[in-house]
């Protein structure tokens, strides 16, 4: 166990809560102390739902530990079933309750309820949130479908032809607190409908236990988020022979590949192949003269496995960026991320420490960071533009508007979210350059009525270029001419230029850095 200011994932019972809260007619009884009820806030504050999660906490206190906490568990289970009347009951423990070993799942199964009971054994001290969500979804499917899968062991993905109906698919993986899951589902359903494909069930998001029992009515499964749905898809393939897709439709090329994969598995002819690329504005921009400004931009990527891998492909193949860093906090996706990094000739960063990520980001000197809410904070400290592509996220990354990441519209959203920070970076650099010009009106009143501060002072303070901070670094002094020249360098690469110049001066034994030294260093590293 470690103490940290930030964490990428919560304990596995939070993942179970995500699945339970995403579904209908299901209830989760969580054996937990008072302090573990904080998870409710994730759904009401960040997801901004209009109702609380379907979770009952036993909320034992310190004084209860001297008595029979098992009776407390049984009482809460009984009250939850009587009050909420769920069609399926989930039973689990938080990390603290796991130490007491009351075995609430066994207690619930011995109480004689006439509903399916799913006992969630989630090892809190070795697994994390996404694994907990995946395991919960898998256990629900296995409990509700186990009898039916014994009857059906080989589902033909092309059986829709003989049945005289349109092909049907399940969309598996979207949950609450996932990154833009709600909008992704709408976009993928729209794409499938355009291709003549119906959606049978979307799960866990918006599904009920009765919907889970209908999963085997579909011809194939769409594994939309590997972290959540891959285990369930593999089990359905093993038990009933249901095929599932592996292409994640994020970006133009992956969306086209996804459509091709779905058509191939269903045996459905693809008639409008030539029209597909024109569904988004991203390909048009990539071919335009304006895109030359983006070519070769250095980008650092970190997030969950699904979004990090997809972002790397878009950055390299569709926008012409140079990927200088790729990593994930998801241990379950480490193998896939390492393979993607190897294709880019870089080493993957697999860690759940935001400090390690910030350090790697600093060393890579990117011009754009694509990451989580934590990378947004780190990038701000380093003066680098950033766009959030993955959970964990802030409330501002759960927009009320339609804003998917997948499909054609998702490609448009990604284009806006990634390109605009770079364009604004150029604008800020131009302001930086001219702010100390005598013709630039620097002392004007703002609309708030406060007097603006001097531009050069702002630049120097923001980027650490004042005498007291830049005066000495490893024995190297910055002269006035050197400082003045450094402020003309775009802020998003200024840190790298400063660091390289100081290394150059030290290697040459120079006692101070002037503008000429900076020019020499630039030529040396070019």
Curated annotation (Swiss-Prot):
Chain sites annotated for binding substrate: 425-426
Co-factor(s): [4Fe-4S] cluster
Keyword ATP-binding found: yes
Pfam families membership: Oxidored_nitro, PCP_red
GO MF terms, alphabetically ordered: 4 iron, 4 sulfur cluster binding; ATP binding; metal ion binding; oxidoreductase activity, acting on iron-sulfur proteins as donors; oxidoreductase activity, acting on the CH-CH group of donors, iron-sulfur protein as acceptor
Keywords: 4Fe-4S, ATP-binding, Chlorophyll biosynthesis, Iron, Iron-sulfur, Metal-binding, Nucleotide-binding, Oxidoreductase, Photosynthesis
Key word Metal-binding present: yes
A GO biological process held by the record: light-independent chlorophyll biosynthetic process
EC number per UniProt: 1.3.7.7
Catalytic residues (positions): 290
Pathway this chain belongs to: Porphyrin-containing compound metabolism; chlorophyll biosynthesis (light-independent)
InterPro entries in the cross-refs: ChlB/BchB/BchZ (IPR050152), LI-POR_suB-like_C (IPR013580), Nase/OxRdtase_comp1 (IPR000510), P-CP_red_C (IPR042298), Protochl_reductB (IPR005969), Protochlorophyllide_Rdtase (IPR016209)
SUPFAM superfamilies xrefs: Helical backbone' metal receptor
Cofactor note: Binds 1 [4Fe-4S] cluster per heterodimer. The cluster is bound at the heterodimer interface by residues from both subunits.
Catalytic activity: chlorophyllide a + oxidized 2[4Fe-4S]-[ferredoxin] + 2 ADP + 2 phosphate = protochlorophyllide a + reduced 2[4Fe-4S]-[ferredoxin] + 2 ATP + 2 H2O
Binding site for [4Fe-4S] cluster: 36
Function: Component of the dark-operative protochlorophyllide reductase (DPOR) that uses Mg-ATP and reduced ferredoxin to reduce ring D of protochlorophyllide (Pchlide) to form chlorophyllide a (Chlide). This reaction is light-independent. The NB-protein (ChlN-ChlB) is the catalytic component of the complex.
Assembly and interaction partners: Protochlorophyllide reductase is composed of three subunits; ChlL, ChlN and ChlB. Forms a heterotetramer of two ChlB and two ChlN subunits.
Family listed: Belongs to the ChlB/BchB/BchZ family.
PANTHER family referenced in this protein's UniProt entry, alphabetically: LIGHT-INDEPENDENT PROTOCHLOROPHYLLIDE REDUCTASE SUBUNIT B
Protein known as: Light-independent protochlorophyllide reductase subunit B
Species of the source: Prochlorococcus marinus (strain MIT 9515)
């Amino acid at each position: 166990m470690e103490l940290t200011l930030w964490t990428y994932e919560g304990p596995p019972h939070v993942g179970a809560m995500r699945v339970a809260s995403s579904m209908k007619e299901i209830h989760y009884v969580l054996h937990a102390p008072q302090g573990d009820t904080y998870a409710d806030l994730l759904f009401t504050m960040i997801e901004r739902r209009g109702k609380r999660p379907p979770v009952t906490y036993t909320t034992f206190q310190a004084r209860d530990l001297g008595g029979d906490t098992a009776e407390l568990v049984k009482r809460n289970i009984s009250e939850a079933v009587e009050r909420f009347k769920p069609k399926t009951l989930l039973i689990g423990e938080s990390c603290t309750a796991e130490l007491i070993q009351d075995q609430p799942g066994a207690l619930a199964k011995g109480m004689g309820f006439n509903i399916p009971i799913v006992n969630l054994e989630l090892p809190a001290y070795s697994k994390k949130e996404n694994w907990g969500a995946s395991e919960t979804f898998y256990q629900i499917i296995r409990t509700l479908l186990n009898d039916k899968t014994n009857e059906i062991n080989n589902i033909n993905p092309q059986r829709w032809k003989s049945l005289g109906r349109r092909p049907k698919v399940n969309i598996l993986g979207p949950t609450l607190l996932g990154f833009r899951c709600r909008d992704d589902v709408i976009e993928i359903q729209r794409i499938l409908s355009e291709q003549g494909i119906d959606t049978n069930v979307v799960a866990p998001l918006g599904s009920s236990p009765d919907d889970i029992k209908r999963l085997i009515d579909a011809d194939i499964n769409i594994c939309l988020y590997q972290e959540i749905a891959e285990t369930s898809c593999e089990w359905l393939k093993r038990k009933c022979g249901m095929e599932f897709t592996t292409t994640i439709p994020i970006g133009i090329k992956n969306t086209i590949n996804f459509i091709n994969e779905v058509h191939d598995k269903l045996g459905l002819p693809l008639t409008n192949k030539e029209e597909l690329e024109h569904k988004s504005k991203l390909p048009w921009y990539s071919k335009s003269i304006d895109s030359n400004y983006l070519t070769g931009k250095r980008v650092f990527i970190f997030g969950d496995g699904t979004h990090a891998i997809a972002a790397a492909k878009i950055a390299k193949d569709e926008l012409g960026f140079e990927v200088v860093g790729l990593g994930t906090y998801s241990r379950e996706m480490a193998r896939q991320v390492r393979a993607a990094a190897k294709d880019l000739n870089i080493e993957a960063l697999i860690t759940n420490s935001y400090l390690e990520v910030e350090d790697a980001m600093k060393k890579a000197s990117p011009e754009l960071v694509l990451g989580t809410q934590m990378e947004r904070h780190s990038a701000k400290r380093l003066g680098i533009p950033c766009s959030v592509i993955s959970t964990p996220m802030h409330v501002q990354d759960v927009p009320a508007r339609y804003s998917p990441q997948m499909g054609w519209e998702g490609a448009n959203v990604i284009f806006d979210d990634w390109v605009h920070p770079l364009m604004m970076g150029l604008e800020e650099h131009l302001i930086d350059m001219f702010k100390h010009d005598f013709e630039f009106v620097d002392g004007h009143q703002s609309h708030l009525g406060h007097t603006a501060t001097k531009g050069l002072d702002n630049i120097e303070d923001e980027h650490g270029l004042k005498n007291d901070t830049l005066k000495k670094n490893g024995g190297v002094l910055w002269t006035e001419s050197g400082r003045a020249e450094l402020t003309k360098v775009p802020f998003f690469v200024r840190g790298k230029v400063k660091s390289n110049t100081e290394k150059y001066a030290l290697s040459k034994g120079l006692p101070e850095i002037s503008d000429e030294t900076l020019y020499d260093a630039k030529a040396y590293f070019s």
